[in-house]
């Protein structure tokens, strides 16, 4: 027995003592003479672990998955066959050189067979045994074997990538496998220190084991404990390789739905902007025109809250009971100085300018607010189902939540159709404004192509005003609007956006539209000028 073998055996820590059968197998393999030259043993400083320099030649034939058996027992425990999960973990693999493969097979077949036989007879530390998926590539050089051993030991400790979802072979419940690239980790031409991350990247696609025992598409399968895949830690993304062996991003492989995250959580900017919106205060400007001062100017005072603005307008501008004229002097107010009959009406009107809505709906989950208490009262009936307004016609049991809806319904009984279509040539009339809105969608469609001499789009005038006139004259010159048209502007229902694009005229006013002021032959003149 050699002194070197005895020394290496005696240096093992006490907690890594193996049974006598395994120790005899190791000693027999170490004492077996070899007919070829062994490279000198590397010092301990190469790997940093004394257990990795014991027998470099036989270690070249050991499957790399053996090194990742149980890293919690220390580096030297990686060589213990008690921690091998299945008998296929130790398997002879064909070398790259046929002569080298024959040479190793001739001298070490019985040595490695003893290891595999003893390993198959031991109870696996990870659960039931598992069939090997295929053969494994051998390490071409002992120095590379030592480097691979250290790397595999680190892999066994800190596994930070998910397994392949494309694997279709059946596994036992307590056993799992993981694929690592052999081209990126174990080939001799790829040994630079900077190009070897702990994982060379997940493969593009996992192939099945072939009957001939060929490697799995250049990837080896390592038997790892099943509890490794239940870690809930958040890991960072592994180092990205730039060579041609690198695989696509690992984010694509999430088919096994594991509780492992390889990228940190990135919270969207929503929370930040919500915080900023709360911090930023919108300035509210008072646009009341001070009539008492000459020249007239805006108040232009700014406030941070709606309550402050409303209080300022009520106290400073609306005035108290001594104020007799209740006129709104807000900038660009459509009332144009028309007074209100009471102060409370002016106060309610000012809410249109300030945007104040002091009456919220008390029902939970609704969230609607109103500027007037009457509107809130009507709205609350939608929650309570109250309908206090009954149809006044005999024999009709319809009830409504507000009086305006009852008024609209009454036209059904009177056969009145006060809602008329204002498009020329259309004499449709309806009893309810909703029916008129549906009808106006017909006119909002694209108009037919124009003839070039006169407009094919009829003007919006009442049907009763164009009787007895020539159609050609009415299309070229607009008729003066009647007083009834101005009163019915509130009942005008046209598509606002569609009218601009399709050429639908707007409701008539006191002044003719620019299209009506143009002569009908304007298109003909523009054509002849070029």
Curated annotation (Swiss-Prot):
SMART domains the record matches: ZnF_C2H2
Positions with biased composition (Polar residues): 520-530
Name of this chain's protein: Zinc finger protein ZIC 4
Function per UniProt: May bind to DNA. Induces neural and neural crest differentiation. Does not induce anterior neural tissue.
Entry comment describing in which tissues the protein is expressed: At mid-gastrula stage (stage 11.5), weakly expressed in the prospective neural fold. Expressed in the neural plate border region at early neurula stage (stage 15) with strongest expression in the prospective regions of the hyoid and branchial crests. Expression in the dorsal central nervous system (CNS) continues through late neurula stage and early tail bud stages with expression strongest in the olfactory placode and expression levels increasing as development progresses. Becomes expressed in somites.
Compositional bias ranges of the Basic residues kind: 31-40, 97-113, 435-444
Biased composition (Low complexity): 455-467, 474-485
Signal peptide: none
Annotated S-S bridges: none
UniProt keyword terms in alphabetical order: Developmental protein, Differentiation, DNA-binding, Metal-binding, Neurogenesis, Nucleus, Repeat, Zinc, Zinc-finger
Organism: Xenopus laevis (African clawed frog)
Main location: nucleus
Keyword Nucleus on entry: yes
